[in-house]
Amino acid sequence: MANVLRFLELVNHPDGMNIGMRHISLSTCGVVPGIDALAEQQLQLTLSVSLHAPDSETRSRIMPVNRAYDVELLFDACHRYFEKTGRRISFEYAMIDGVNDNDWQADLIAKKLRGMPGHVNLIPLNDV
């Protein structure tokens, strides 16, 4: 996290790239301690979370990080992040046919994100 924060400081600094924090999006696969540490910084950047599944079983198959930081812990961290920063979160969701694009999963996402302003970016995956 120290390197990420140093990088953000450098690109934001007037003698660096002078990019405003509101123009920066920081993506994470869902490392909960990193999200909590970032919340403490109160930066005005956009946090983007690679969600890809709202349930632990599916997310563990798609994203091995879920075995270390379960999706329930991730949702809790995102709620804490919003409470601490007041910044909405962008949730990235690659839709995989028959894996994570079911109605019940959409309903579960809505339930888990209720009360937390955010944006769900649905990314349809195409057959190659």
Question: Which sequence ranges carry the predicted segments?
Answer:
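Conserved AdoMet/S-adenosylmethionine-binding subsite of the radical SAM
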Residues: 1-128
